Amino acid sequence: MVLTDLYGRPVLSLRIQLNTTCNFNCFFCHMEGTEISGEALKPEEIERVVKIAHKFGVNKIKLTGGEPTLRRDLIDIVKRIRKYITGNISMTTNGVMLPILAYELKKAGLDRVNISMHAFDEDTFQAITGVNSRDRIIKAIDAANEAGLTPVKINFVVLRDLNVDQIPDMIELAAEKHAILQLIEYETTREGESSKEYLKYHMPLDSLEKEIADKALSIERNELHNRPRYIIRTQAGEVKVEFVKPQRNPDFCAHCTRLRITSEGEFKTCLMRSDTNVKFKGINDEKTISELFRQAVLRREPYWRPGDEVRQNEVLAKSIIQNKRK
């Protein structure tokens, strides 16, 4: 039986945060809406909550971090999840460990990966991530393809005056590697919109999307968040470019069918909120966890509502003023 929240949104998938540690230091990382924490959920705890979620109709899992490949028990975790989930199991990763782990992850039951690559050239890559690993990420994409962790999605957070000029190269790279390129809007909470980093680097993607749409051979829709995906032709062949535009986007929230699980053992109803979290860590009784799961679903509500998109103009005005003062 699929559970539906009070806004008519079914919960069809889980986004499971395996840890909060990472070997990159991207300044815009939202850390899945959590803080750096200590002990993470054990494999058997993750298995238990997946088993319960599956009883409620969940059949799709996304593994995230931090950086999930830093967990030494990652293969075991994937195997445990696959016992219950017949749908898609995917993982978001920076890719550093993929050349080593790709085949074992596929064998364990992982279907595909999202690989974060926020710049095409080495200098910008290092400026964003704090590490000199651009070439290794290219190898990670190749390793994922060779292992069958496909289709690979390349996550690219668009940052004004930092990596926008590299989007054409990223599109060609995605086409060459038979990957899907996800152009992702830099997102934050309402309070975070006034931060220096956000005002400096946030860029609405509407004009960029129109440019891509004008070149598109066809368009698809990702049911999650109703995200548009354009098929365009490049020198390396056809490629899919998907736009992820969450900031002040009521339509994005209206199509959210995902419940999050934090590494500390909480059901998290929304990336942007922690006040509605429901803790299940330390509870072994499946009946009790099932009830907590129900509670979490009923606490879900859209973060962005109709009318919030209008205030985006105020945020843009602040950004323009700040950048003129540079």
UniProtKB/Swiss-Prot annotation:
Look at the named UniProt entry and state the broad enzyme category this protein falls under. lyase
Pfam families given for it?
A: Fer4_12, Mob_synth_C, Radical_SAM
Instruction: Give the residues the record marks as binding S-adenosyl-L-methionine.
Output: 66, 116
GO process terms (BP): Mo-molybdopterin cofactor biosynthetic process
Sites binding [4Fe-4S] cluster 2 sit at: 253, 256, 270
Q: Name the catalysed reactions.
A: GTP + AH2 + S-adenosyl-L-methionine = (8S)-3',8-cyclo-7,8-dihydroguanosine 5'-triphosphate + 5'-deoxyadenosine + L-methionine + A + H(+)
Q: Which InterPro entries match?
A: Aldolase_TIM, Elp3/MiaA/NifB-like_rSAM, MoaA_arc, MoaA_NifB_PqqE_Fe-S-bd_CS, MoaA_twitch, MoCo_biosynth_MoaA/MoaC, rSAM
Sorted alphabetically, the keyword list is: 4Fe-4S, GTP-binding, Iron, Iron-sulfur, Lyase, Metal-binding, Molybdenum cofactor biosynthesis, Nucleotide-binding, S-adenosyl-L-methionine
Q: Name one GO molecular function term.
A: GTP 3',8'-cyclase activity
Cofactor note text: Binds 2 [4Fe-4S] clusters. Binds 1 [4Fe-4S] cluster coordinated with 3 cysteines and an exchangeable S-adenosyl-L-methionine and 1 [4Fe-4S] cluster coordinated with 3 cysteines and the GTP-derived substrate.
Q: Which residues bind GTP?
A: 15, 62, 92, 153, 258-260
Q: Which cofactor does it need?
A: [4Fe-4S] cluster
Pathway involvement?
Cofactor biosynthesis; molybdopterin biosynthesis
All copies of the Radical SAM core domain together span 6-235
Q: What is its EC number?
A: 4.1.99.22
**Which CDD domains does the record cross-reference, listed alphabetically?**
Radical_SAM, Twitch_MoaA
Residues annotated as binding [4Fe-4S] cluster 1: 22, 26, 29
Q: What domain of life does the native source organism fall in?
A: Archaea
Q: What does this protein do?
A: Catalyzes the cyclization of GTP to (8S)-3',8-cyclo-7,8-dihydroguanosine 5'-triphosphate.
**What family does this belong to?**
Belongs to the radical SAM superfamily. MoaA family.
Name of the protein in its database record: Probable GTP 3',8-cyclase
